């Protein structure tokens, strides 16, 4: 994996180019990973995604917690000359990164042991050791994979829990650094330590002590427990820790921060020097019946961050979900129709919502890259912060409780998981 910086600005972060493998496409950073569940982009078939969302190669974010049951099948697939991990899930031509936890769902706390990390899957809790993890990575053969780490920390974690997370991560990574040569994939060094600057420094020091070429980038973990918790983070606590960490890292390696961070938080993190994020925020919005409507184009109109499709007020609103949007959903359908699909539990409902939300979020990142190139990120941040209003907009996502009836729900919309 090769990473080159095009420009760095004190006010707008940095613009870069990322080439994950030789012969692969050059990707502009700040970059958006496409979050998947069980190897698929939620609710979207490969044909729908590639026909109506993006015709360009993307980086797919696979998670072990939703794909661990595929290990044996992937071993046979790759040994038989299969077309890689992306090809196995029906998305050939796209790059991929393998992570441990699903950023879309709240990760349960506890279950930590000295030599294993708990992996919460559909079948319950599995025990994951460093040895087992590397065996699974060898079976998956991803383009990039994160190092195994104890990320069971958040803002409320005690110092003892934070220190244990750092110590256990160092132990996991000691084995992984020794055996990484057996896997032809790029390793990301995990940086853990909760909201403790001393612990974060210790984690960074351990990574930077490794021989040159041991890893290709950094992944920050342990700020939240995934799912909707990432949308409610206190940035006044988060940003100083990120700034503290970034100052200690070399500039020629990408920095990844997974989680459903809000658009405003993402802009502030980009200014701090973070390069790669994921689309779990768009999924969380779709799961909770919200269409993203925040504006990132300068105009004189006041905007709102979401359209709640459960709202009875839109049942006779025959305008597009977002009038300026060019996605399939907004070009072909109306707010009233989305509300009707919600009320009738139709599978098409979440499909159309996800098409719009992913399209809108990808366009947002296009605008981010243009703003960074022009050193105009502060202006974009101000627009996203207030949406041309007088007060700061709230981008946090609350679990939607207006489910009609769990007993009668079909395979479309599902009850939102907290």
UniProtKB/Swiss-Prot annotation:
Its cofactor is Zn(2+). The keyword tRNA processing applies. Gene3D superfamilies: Queuine tRNA-ribosyltransferase-like. One of its GO terms (cellular component) is cytoplasm. Zn(2+) binds at residues 325, 327, 330, 356. GO terms for molecular function: metal ion binding; tRNA-guanosine(34) queuine transglycosylase activity. It holds the Pfam family TGT. Transmembrane segments: none annotated. Binds 1 zinc ion per subunit. It is found in: Cytoplasm. One of its GO terms (biological process) is tRNA-guanine transglycosylation. Keywords: Cytoplasm, Metal-binding, tRNA processing, Zinc. The keyword DNA-binding does not apply. Heterodimer of a catalytic subunit and an accessory subunit. Non-catalytic subunit of the queuine tRNA-ribosyltransferase (TGT) that catalyzes the base-exchange of a guanine (G) residue with queuine (Q) at position 34 (anticodon wobble position) in tRNAs with GU(N) anticodons (tRNA-Asp, -Asn, -His and -Tyr), resulting in the hypermodified nucleoside queuosine (7-(((4,5-cis-dihydroxy-2-cyclopenten-1-yl)amino)methyl)-7-deazaguanosine). Belongs to the queuine tRNA-ribosyltransferase family. QTRT2 subfamily. NCBIfam families: tgt_general (TIGR00449). PANTHER family: QUEUINE TRNA-RIBOSYLTRANSFERASE ACCESSORY SUBUNIT 2. This is Queuine tRNA-ribosyltransferase accessory subunit 2. It comes from Drosophila erecta.
């Amino acid at each position: 994996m090769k990473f080159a910086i095009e420009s760095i600005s004190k006010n707008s972060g940095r613009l870069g180019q990322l080439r994950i493998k030789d012969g692969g496409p050059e990707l502009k950073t700040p970059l958006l990973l496409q979050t998947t569940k069980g190897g698929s982009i939620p609710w979207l078939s490969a044909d729908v995604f590639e026909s109506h969302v993006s015709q360009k190669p993307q980086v797919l974010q696979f998670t072990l917690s939703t794909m661990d049951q595929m290990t044996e099948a992937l071993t046979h697939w790759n040994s038989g000359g299969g077309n890689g991990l992306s090809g196995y899930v029906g998305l050939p031509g796209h790059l991929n990164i393998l992570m441990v936890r699903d950023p879309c769902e709240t990760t349960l706390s506890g279950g930590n042991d000295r030599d294993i990390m708990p992996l919460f899957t559909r079948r319950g809790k599995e025990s994951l050791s460093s040895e087992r993890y590397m065996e699974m990575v060898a079976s998956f053969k991803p383009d990039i994979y994160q190092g195994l780490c104890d990320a069971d920390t958040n803002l409320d974690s005690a110092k003892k829990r934070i220190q244990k997370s750092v110590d256990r991560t160092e132990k996991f990574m000691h084995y992984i650094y020794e055996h990484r040569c057996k896997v032809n994939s790029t390793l990301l060094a995990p940086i853990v330590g909760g909201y403790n600057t001393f612990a974060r420094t210790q984690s960074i020091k351990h990574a930077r002590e490794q021989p040159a070429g041991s890893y290709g980038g950094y992944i920050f973990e342990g700020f939240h427990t995934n799912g909707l918790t990432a949308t409610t983070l206190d940035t006044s606590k988060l940003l100083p820790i990120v700034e503290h960490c970034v100052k200690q890292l070399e500039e020629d390696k990408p920095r990844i921060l997974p989680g459903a961070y809000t658009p405003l938080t993402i802009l502030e993190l980009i200014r701090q020097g973070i390069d790669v994020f994921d689309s779990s925020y768009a999924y969380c919005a779709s799961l909770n019946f919200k269409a993203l409507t925040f504006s990132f184009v300068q105009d004189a109109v006041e905007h709102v961050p979401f359209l709640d499709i459960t709202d009875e007020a839109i049942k006779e609103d025959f305008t597009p979900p977002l009038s300026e949007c060019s996605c399939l959903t907004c070009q072909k359908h109306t707010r009233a129709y989305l509300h009707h699909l919600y009320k009738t539990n139709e599978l098409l409902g979440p499909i159309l919502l996800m098409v719009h939300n992913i399209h809108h979020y990808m366009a947002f990142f296009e605008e981010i890259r243009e703003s960074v190139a022009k050193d105009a990120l502060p202006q974009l941040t101000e627009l996203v912060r207030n949406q041309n209003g007088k007060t700061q907009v709230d981008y946090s996502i609350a679990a939607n409780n207006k489910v009609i009836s769990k007993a009668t729900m079909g395979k479309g919309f599902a009850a939102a998981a907290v």
